Regions:
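Flexible loop/turn segments at secondary-structure boundaries
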Residues: 12-14, 39-42, 105-106, 136
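Conserved strand-to-helix beginnings and helix N-cap segments that scaffold or border functional pockets
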Residues: 15-18, 43, 110, 147
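Active-site microenvironment of metallo-dependent hydrolases
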Residues: 73-166
């Protein structure tokens, strides 16, 4: 069965919504959650997916946080045809994001999935391990000159924008 991508924020910005996570699930449709637009923020996209579904369905239980998290991890990997991603299992890439839960914002943590989906943001990320290598430590991206990268990005955006006819 094909995997249906769910891009809530993009749809909502354009005045539309993808109706319901739980109705697709009940029909046996595998779902993934992803983003392809600014801001590239999976925490925000998980929050948006849960919130939009709850608004559309007028019910809080239709987009459980653990299911939205699964859409963003296992569902995303499955949607890409990558069984080696999105899960912590033997033979899979060791891609791990460690999020701080010892902060005032996160406390008390009754349900880590609810925190990750409904409250967390990039600033809560402490460490990121990609294929077994630490690439973020203490919330800081390692081996990247971020100010220089941002400057190059802004310069490239200006070049592209100058070529666009508005």
């Amino acid at each position: 069965m094909r995997c249906r991508p769910n891009v809530k924020q993009v749809k909502a910005r354009r005045g539309g919504v993808i109706k319901s996570i739980h109705k697709y699930r009940e029909m046996g449709v595998r779902q993934s959650l992803g983003t392809d637009t600014f801001p590239l923020d999976m925490f925000n996209d998980m929050r948006m997916a849960a919130t939009v579904c709850r608004i559309v369905e007028h019910a809080v239980d239709v987009a459980p946080s653990h299911e939205v998290f699964t859409m963003a991890t296992v569902g995303g990997a499955d949607g890409l045809g990558r069984p080696d991603l999105g899960r912590l299992a033997a033979g899979c890439k060791a891609d791990i994001v460690l999020v701080r839960t010892d902060t005032f914002k996160a406390s008390p943590v009754y349900d880590p999935f609810k925190f990750l989906v409904l409250s967390a943001c990039g600033d809560d990320v402490d460490r990121v391990i990609v294929d077994g290598r630490t690439v973020v430590q203490g919330g800081v991206v390692l081996n990247v000159d971020m100010p220089a990268a941002v400057a190059r990005l802004n310069e490239a955006a200006l070049r592209v924008r100058s070529r666009i006819v508005l």
